[in-house]
């Protein structure tokens, strides 16, 4: 399984510039920021990892992210090197993305569909979506929680709950579910 999200997970990753506020950034904002060198992929990835740490397991404990890719910062560094050399793979090069936990990826992240029955389920291939994202240089940041089995358990199951990640909280009203 990929690295479990924890408060001390990124202690060694001290930002070299003031922390990047990623809350309001759209994809076009991110692409423009990377292309104009306003921030690096490492800055962006670090900011998202720090935000996951602050909101997912600690703070309001949203349970939105099941695991993070321990290689994310290394991949961000490689993207920054490509951009510095003027050879990014695509406009998405260096953009961190979360995958829903039912999408296969051949890295250190298990694909569980939110079920403890699939903990440790490692695949040897990327789904076509993930292969395309990787070819573009996007960084698989981690796996997002989902309704267990993508809510194909029953017609009366709780949306946003999985045995691996727990119940995803609504970030705006914490005592309500996200769905």
Locations of regions flagged by a protein language model:
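An N-terminal boundary/leader segment
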Residues: 1-84
